[in-house]
């Protein structure tokens, strides 16, 4: 089973433009992320996929592998699918470009789902963590997920799901963590299927998979990634080196 990591890397960012090219201890954020993914030794190959010549050249000139994205894309899945459609690969792991301090364990967790899936019932694997604070549960930036008894996703939402009409029934609220592993075919199917109303309403690409009947296996984790979304995040990351 050939497993690769793909790091989608857009140059533009609404909250922090050009964040991936910011200096982080003598290396750019995107280069640190790329090298950290390689150093996990989990992947047969690692690629950065980008719409930016600056980012592309940054990786290539530092002996890395990068692919220029040809089209404009609505989502990370679309960008990855375009890049890998002609690659010989079985499983594709999406690594966030703005998380230079990669934790190996959660990546191992999503990969292991496919090693155990001998009957190929899983199309995607992703992570979730329990949240208990009311503000975290109600925050629309924290995407919530509900799963069935076997851990397959039933729905993702920015709203509070399930709604607490009765509060004392032992409901655990789960936040979706945006680390994905895909079967190649699931990505290619996604790429060629139009967006439907649920994805358009919530602005959550994972809903396209559910709307078209794909099965997403969710694994509970305690992992919380350290992402760089603001200048303050960057300063915090610099202090960790």
Curated annotation (Swiss-Prot):
Any single GO BP term: lipopolysaccharide biosynthetic process
GO molecular function: 3-deoxy-manno-octulosonate cytidylyltransferase activity
GO cellular component terms, A-Z: cytosol
EC number(s) per entry: 2.7.7.38
Keywords: Cytoplasm, Lipopolysaccharide biosynthesis, Nucleotidyltransferase, Transferase
Disulfide bridge map: none
Localization, UniProt: Cytoplasm
Family of the protein in this entry: Belongs to the KdsB family.
Listed PANTHER family: 3-DEOXY-MANNO-OCTULOSONATE CYTIDYLYLTRANSFERASE, 3-DEOXY-MANNO-OCTULOSONATE CYTIDYLYLTRANSFERASE, MITOCHONDRIAL
Function: Activates KDO (a required 8-carbon sugar) for incorporation into bacterial lipopolysaccharide in Gram-negative bacteria.
The name this protein goes by in its record: 3-deoxy-manno-octulosonate cytidylyltransferase
Organism per entry: Flavobacterium psychrophilum (strain ATCC 49511 / DSM 21280 / CIP 103535 / JIP02/86)
Lineage, highest ranks first: Bacteria, Pseudomonadati, Bacteroidota, Flavobacteriia, Flavobacteriales
